[in-house]
């Protein structure tokens, strides 16, 4: 846009500022306390599945692409992808397609330096594995699997689980849990990705088992500065057994993490602040990103969390619970 010089400094300056106003992007800081509204359950597992859970979501070409874990009536795990949809209200009618391979607790993102989509997951041929594709909407169009991480952790009944992958300008980072009160990290040069992180890792958070249980996710905060440049959420188990999320922040992906909204009564997201009436559990999911790439960027002005919940009256074994998707939207 071209601006013409005008006489009369006050009037011309006012017009100039008004003209510029629409081009100024508002920036929001992460809140110190969180309060949400919630949808009802958004989709029901198709016949043969008892649960849809462990969601990963990207928005590409204006549509949500969601992958998830499934369980059957015996508690066996598998994985699936939804047909791409524009609005959360469309999720119920979106197709549900089983993957021809088991990609449990998936992480989906676009690796921009190599122009390739990556699907990472657990319980493949390595501790964590990945596949690549040019079209993530083709649920069974993925490459053969490759090793993402080969390390083993001790002091865990599950082993390493619930990975997430994120990158900055120079490195890619792998974060994961172990149902044991610890969060772990591994890293590699971004130039070597996609590839294996190898077997080395470090323990970056340690606490009570129920306080740092599983489902770790890490994000770049759009416009974030200082200690709030990066956001981590970790699933915890509350005093009555219900699941909720605690949050942590950091100034760098390779740095130290500081607790932010980390108590059961003032969590990042949980029964205390979710606004959900159909579930008492806010469990394994993914913040909606404003960029599908490896930076895992979220907009603090428009935070939404795709999560798994279930009917509070269902008291089955964890792997038989009827988990379904719901979405939280942060109150502004």
From Swiss-Prot:
<protein>
    <recommendedName>
        <fullName>Alpha-L-arabinofuranosidase axhA</fullName>
        <ecNumber>3.2.1.55</ecNumber>
    </recommendedName>
</protein>
<feature type="signal peptide">
    <location>
        <begin position="1"/>
        <end position="26"/>
    </location>
</feature>
<dbReference type="GO" id="GO:0046556">
    <property type="term" value="F:alpha-L-arabinofuranosidase activity"/>
</dbReference>
<keyword id="KW-0732">Signal</keyword>
<dbReference type="Pfam" id="PF03664">
    <property type="entry name" value="Glyco_hydro_62"/>
</dbReference>
<dbReference type="GO" id="GO:0046373">
    <property type="term" value="P:L-arabinose metabolic process"/>
</dbReference>
<dbReference type="GO" id="GO:0005576">
    <property type="term" value="C:extracellular region"/>
</dbReference>
<dbReference type="InterPro" id="IPR005193">
    <property type="entry name" value="GH62_arabinosidase"/>
</dbReference>
<dbReference type="GO" id="GO:0045493">
    <property type="term" value="P:xylan catabolic process"/>
</dbReference>
<keyword id="KW-0624">Polysaccharide degradation</keyword>
<keyword id="KW-0326">Glycosidase</keyword>
<keyword id="KW-0858">Xylan degradation</keyword>
<comment type="function">
    <text>Alpha-L-arabinofuranosidase involved in the hydrolysis of xylan, a major structural heterogeneous polysaccharide found in plant biomass representing the second most abundant polysaccharide in the biosphere, after cellulose. Releases L-arabinose from arabinoxylan.</text>
</comment>
<keyword id="KW-0964">Secreted</keyword>
<keyword id="KW-0119">Carbohydrate metabolism</keyword>
<comment type="similarity">
    <text>Belongs to the glycosyl hydrolase 62 family.</text>
</comment>
<dbReference type="InterPro" id="IPR023296">
    <property type="entry name" value="Glyco_hydro_beta-prop_sf"/>
</dbReference>
<keyword id="KW-0378">Hydrolase</keyword>
């Amino acid at each position: 846009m071209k601006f013409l010089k005008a006489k009369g400094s006050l009037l011309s300056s006012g017009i100039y500022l008004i003209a510029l106003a629409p081009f100024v992007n508002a920036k929001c800081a992460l809140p110190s306390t969180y309060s949400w509204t919630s949808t009802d359950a958004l989709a029901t597992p198709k016949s043969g599945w008892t649960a849809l859970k462990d969601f990963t979501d990207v928005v590409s070409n204006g549509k949500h692409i969601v992958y998830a874990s499934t369980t059957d009536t015996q508690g066996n795990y598998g994985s699936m992808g939804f047909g791409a949809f524009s609005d959360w209200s469309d999720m119920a009618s979106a197709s549900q397609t089983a993957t021809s391979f088991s990609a449990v607790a998936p992480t989906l993102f676009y690796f921009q330096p190599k122009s390739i989509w990556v699907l990472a997951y657990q319980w493949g041929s390595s501790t964590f594995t990945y596949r690549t594709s040019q079209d993530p909407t083709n649920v069974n169009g993925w490459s053969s699997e490759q090793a993402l991480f080969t390390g083993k952790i001790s002091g865990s009944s599950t082993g390493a689980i619930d990975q997430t992958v994120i990158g900055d300008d120079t490195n890619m980072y792998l974060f994961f849990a172990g149902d044991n009160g610890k969060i772990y990290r591994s890293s590699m040069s971004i130039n070597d990705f996609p590839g294996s992180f190898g077997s080395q890792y470090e323990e970056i958070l340690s606490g009570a088992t129920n306080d740092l249980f599983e489902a770790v996710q890490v994000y770049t905060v759009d416009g974030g500065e200082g200690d709030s440049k990066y956001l981590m959420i970790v699933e915890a188990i509350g005093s009555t057994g219900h699941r909720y999320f605690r949050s942590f922040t950091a100034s760098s992906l390779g740095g130290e993490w500081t607790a932010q909204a980390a108590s059961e009564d003032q969590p990042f997201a949980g029964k205390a602040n979710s606004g959900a009436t159909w579930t008492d559990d806010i469990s394994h999911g993914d913040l909606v990103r404003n960029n599908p790439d490896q930076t895992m960027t979220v907009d603090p002005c428009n935070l939404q969390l795709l999560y798994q919940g279930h009917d509070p009256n269902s008291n089955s074994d964890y792997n038989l619970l009827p988990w379904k998707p719901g979405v939280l939207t942060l109150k502004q």
